């Protein structure tokens, strides 16, 4: 069976490794990115074509995949001059691997559907190293028939591929997951910071908390920095701040509010303003340790 031609926009660390995995598996890829260096790395492996127009890339592809930073960037790529909406063929599919606002995803999906184009939101779990080997966790959502159409491709990109329901459910689930994770890390980091201010030994605090129900991978994650001074970059404060902002907006769109998310978002923004944006989330410990009333 002939493999579909894949258009891929967004060749950052995650996206670049995802494309390398596709190339190793014999896919023809059409790529677009602001970084010529990233594009050149793809072209050097062969079976690849560079595009500078999203419209033209879409017209030359059966499935278009996005691995972009924000909902605003996704909307610009879709709706902008020479955008995907103008170029995607009837029967083709758009897959958004980023973490986006569900309301935006649903709007894009509805506009694509008017052209006979399907859409799947499929935010990712795990790391760029997993992406290179096709071992990601993929939280896909969208029309069941569209999902089944692209599942053979997703199975080559992810070890665990979940179908979570209607379009937008993937992004909703990812934002809920990140809300739980980032609020937990921020809380634990402040706990270590308060202990330091109070003269309580961080290792002893960790030993006590990890012996009870508070023990978790997140606790270990925070301890690496707050106690051991080791920064293991997994997720930046800037990205956490963006995702918490999306979660707050999503909750507001649902007619509710989240005071917990708003408070955590305020702390993350303060850490960004303090110059910690590109550091790992547990480094927010430094912000809390210096925080004065």
Located regions from the model:
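NAD(P)+-binding Rossmann beta1-loop-alpha1 motif at the extreme N-terminus of oxidoreductases
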Residues: 1-67, 92, 97
